[in-house]
Amino acid sequence: MSTYNFKKEVKVYVVSGGNQYQIDVSDISFSQTFKETSYPVKTLHTLSNVFEGSVINSANNADFEFSMPAIVEADYTIIESLLLQAESFDLFVKTEADVFKLETAVITNGSFVIERSRPLSINISGEALKLTRGATLTGTALSRSATFSFTIPTIDITLNSSSLSNIFRVGIELQNDISWTPYKTVNGALSSTNASTSMYPSSFSLDKKILSGSITQYLLSDNTSSTQDWDTDATLSIKAGNGASGSNFRGFSFGPATCSFTNRINAGEVFLQGYDWRMTENPTSLATILKYETD
């Protein structure tokens, strides 16, 4: 009897540096497409040939995305490291029926999701060189923590030495802007007869990083100092976690770092004001500015 692939049965593994990390996800998707080029076949002698021929010999880069909880334990910190450093890894998606491999994957976007009364989470999206089915899971499996703890965040934001209160929503997002080096040769095109012999991208390079986000605040009578304003040299820090200080803090932290921001009013049923910010300084180590702090 045939076996179906169900998303609810999926197990996700990241393999980096020879180690295998199992990541519990709440959702995942992935795909890869091939490039198709058409060419005319109509001639003076075959005017009825109005449908063009097709050439398929190369693939686009694969895409993937998944969501994961930002737990207190350190089981998922490999994701933070791969995001900050834009390092390649292999991503495996295992079902009851099959194993799918995304080879030479890189994270292009990591969104740190911070909402009141909801556990911290991270949304990841990225690209990969090649997607294959029927793969074999590799790497040395690392042990997992015995506990699995969520964090309902306490939010602490300071902008230009002033504390922002009455926060409705916060977002932090790191983008890795990459470019794939295509692998296209005459010999490769001639030898491409099916998907396995198609030409795939050969490598990627990092062009730039963008660290930005948003802060949505209830608009009150005593917090209007930055309403409809902007600043290109603001100092911003954000902490969303268990509310502890120092080495006991668990959760997301950003800054203090130099940023630009614009502020705008949102006139809904309850008036809000939103800060759209972007980091403008270039730290020696991004890991000292943006942190997912765990046990």
Positions of PLM-derived features:
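Signature of extracytoplasmic/envelope-associated structural regions
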Residues: 1-295
